[in-house]
Regions:
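Phosphate/nucleotide-binding beta-alpha loop and adjacent structural elements of enzyme active sites
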Residues: 1-194
Length: 194
């Protein structure tokens, strides 16, 4: 997004990574040292010393992930106290975004719990081993308005479907995925009837 001229606001709750991002990213990318959730607070984040990019604020996710495809090697062996903000607070501070990417290891619904308005384009990471997490996200987004969905599998950077699909179709597709399928990002765009 930055490469095409978008203003980027990135949230990073872990102190070490927030410092790294501030030191290495272009200065006009704003790095907010906070997690995003349903309310402003502090929280205890489960951190993997070996794989710190899969840290999570969702206790159920950490417990269930140990047996999920792709996570068997991850051990959450430490905790970090982190500041939590909300999407609404970020919007109040930085303005309404055109796009929000949510990749928070099982905490997606909590992030959307701190949002009170529809956003034009949102993507969330989906993990076939945890379909209920993404099904709840689809339902939450549909509460905001008529979203259409399209997945990107793995790191392909290509939409899976030639046509965007409604919430029930996206749910049916997600429910049909084998639990050992590749993860990816589920994009949701607000439909505007012409």
């Amino acid at each position: 997004m930055y490469a095409v001229g978008a203003r980027v606001i990135a949230c990073e709750p872990q102190e070490l990574f927030a410092r790294y991002l501030r030191a290495t990213l272009p200065r006009d990318i704003t790095v907010v040292h906070a997690a995003v959730g349903k309310e402003e607070t502090t929280a205890s984040m489960a951190v993997s010393s070996s794989h710190p990019t899969v840290s999570s604020l969702k206790p159920d996710f950490v417990v269930g992930a140990s047996s999920a495809p792709g996570f068997g090697h991850v051990k959450w062996d430490t905790r970090e106290s982190v500041t939590v903000t909300t999407l609404d607070r970020l919007i109040e501070t930085h303005g309404v975004p055109s796009y929000v990417k949510i990749d928070v290891e099982g905490f997606e619904l909590d992030v959307l719990g701190g949002l009170s308005q529809a956003i034009e384009l949102i993507s969330v990471e989906f993990l076939p081993g945890f379909p209920d997490l993404t099904l709840q996200v689809i339902d939450r987004l549909m509460d905001f308005g008529p979203y259409q969905f399209n997945p990107v599998m793995g790191e392909t950077a290509r939409f899976l479907w030639p046509q965007w699909r409604d919430g029930p179709a996206a749910r049916a597709w997600l429910e049909s995925l084998p639990s050992d399928s590749s993860s990816g990002d589920l994009f949701a765009r607000l439909r505007h009837d012409s």
